[in-house]
Amino acid sequence: IDLLSQSYWNNSVLRAIEGSVEPFYDDAQAFNALDPASPEFWDLADQYFDMDWYVDYIIAESWMANTDWPGNNIRIYRSDKTNYRWRFCLLDMELGLLPNGWTDCYFDHINHMLGQDPNNPYINVWLKGMQNPRFRNYFINRFADLMNTSYKIERISAIEQSMFNQTVLEMPREYSRWGDPNNVAQQMTDFVNRHHEFQFQLSERTGQVRNHIQADLGLNGQVEVTIDAFPAGAGTIKISTVTPDARPWTGVYFDGNPVVITATPNPGYAFVYWDANSIFTSPDFNASIELNIPTDE
C-alpha cells in the first residue's frame, strides 16, 4: 500500500506514511498529459485515479463548504484492492459550515473550486475533468443524485440529531472536568445553541448548492423529476446512479445536463414503453433513454 498525507502541520509537503510519494507524482504527471477533449479521457484517467470515488470525494468536500482544503487535510492511498488507482479520503471537515466553520450554508464552494490553482494535483483532476463532457455530465448528475438521497435534508438532519442526542447527556461531565466547572449551565446552553445552528445550516445547504451549480456551471434551471412503474412491482427504474427502493420517487435535476433513465423488468414482466409527456409526445419504446429534462415531469 502507498498511504500519503499532506497537512499544514508538516509544512504542506506530501509525505509517505506507508510506501512512497513518487508513484503519485508519476501518475499525476501522466494524468496532466491527457487531453480532456478526448472521448477516452474518463477511461484513461480512471487508470490513475478511481474516478467514481474521486467525484464522490469532491462532492462531499463541496457540499460541506470545506475551505481548509485542497491545500490541507490531504490523505491519499492506493493498493491492490484499488487496482493501484488513487483514492482520496475525507478528514478534518470541522471547518465547513457554521457554527464552527470558516464558511456557512450560503458559501459558493463550486466557485471556490473553479478558482483553485491547477498546479495543485488534488483539485486539478476536477478542474481538468470539468473540461470533459462525460466527466462534467457525471459530476453534475452525481451531485444531484446525492442531494436527492444521501444528502437529503431529512436524512442529514436525523443523523446530526441522533449524534446530538447521544452526546448531550455526557456534556455536563465533560464541561465539569475539561471546561469551566463553575459555569456548566452556560456551556450547556451554548452547546444546545450550536446544535440548533448546525441543524439550520444543514437544512439550508442543499438548496444553496443547487443554485450555485446552476449559476456557476451555466445550467438553465432545476427540475423535479418523478418516476414510477406500472403495475406496482413490475420492475426497477434507475435514474443516473440512483435506483429508488420505493416509487413514485421524485428528485431534483438540472435542465441543460442530460440524464439517463433505465427501466429493468422483474422476472415475469417485460418493459413496454415510457408514457408520453411534455418531453416526448408519443410513447418511447427504448428501455434506456438519455434526455434533457427542461420542465418538472
Sequence positions of predicted segments:
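A short, amphipathic beta-strand motif
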Residues: 223-231, 235-239
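Middle-to-C-terminal accessory/interaction subdomains
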Residues: 18-226
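Conserved ATP-binding subdomain of kinase catalytic cores across diverse folds
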Residues: 1-19
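Surface-exposed interfaces of beta-sheet-rich extracellular modules
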Residues: 175, 179, 258-284
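Conserved "repeat-terminator" motif of extracellular CCP/Sushi domains
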Residues: 221, 285-297
